[in-house]
Curated annotation (Swiss-Prot):
Name of this protein: Large ribosomal subunit protein eL34x
Pfam families: Ribosomal_L34e (PF01199)
Record-level GO cellular component terms: cytosol; cytosolic large ribosomal subunit; cytosolic ribosome
Swiss-Prot/TrEMBL GO biological process terms: translation
Keywords from the named record: Ribonucleoprotein, Ribosomal protein
UniProt-annotated stretches for the region Disordered: 31-50
A GO molecular function held by the record: mRNA binding
Keyword Heme appears in the UniProt entry: no
Family: Belongs to the eukaryotic ribosomal protein eL34 family.
Length: 120
């Protein structure tokens, strides 16, 4: 006769957060063992891609006590938050904006010089 199995917790619905495995104990009984969800790892909010160099863990596992700082981040600006492509894009955009400001300033000075030159 097949042994009947009962969930060990009160949560009785077959949801994603309540997944179980059937395991045989050393005493020969079958029991349910809760399985952990697979970790997808951190994603870049800009590109949506996985961030390279950071392990795929559940959110609680990234806490200070469980993971060293060098395993939680990547050694660059926005390391561990944005992907390398997104950071490069931001740096280039910031540079181009600054260049545009300088060009605008130079053009304004040239215009002012032209206005003052013909008068004298």
């Amino acid at each position: 006769m097949v042994q009947r199995l009962v969930y060990r917790s009160r949560h009785s619905y077959a949801t994603k957060s309540n997944q179980h495995r059937i395991v045989k104990t050393p005493g020969g009984k079958l029991t349910y063992q809760t399985t952990n969800k697979r970790a997808s790892g951190p994603k870049c909010p800009v590109t949506g891609k996985r961030i390279q160099g950071i392990p795929h863990l559940r959110p609680a596992e990234y806490k200070r006590s469980r993971l060293a700082r060098n395993e939680r981040t990547v050694n660059r600006a926005y390391g561990g938050v944005l992907s390398g492509v997104a950071v490069r894009e931001r740096i280039v955009r910031a540079f181009l904006v600054e260049e545009q400001k300088i060009v605008k300033k130079v053009l304004k000075l040239q215009k002012a010089k032209e206005k003052t030159a013909p008068k004298s």
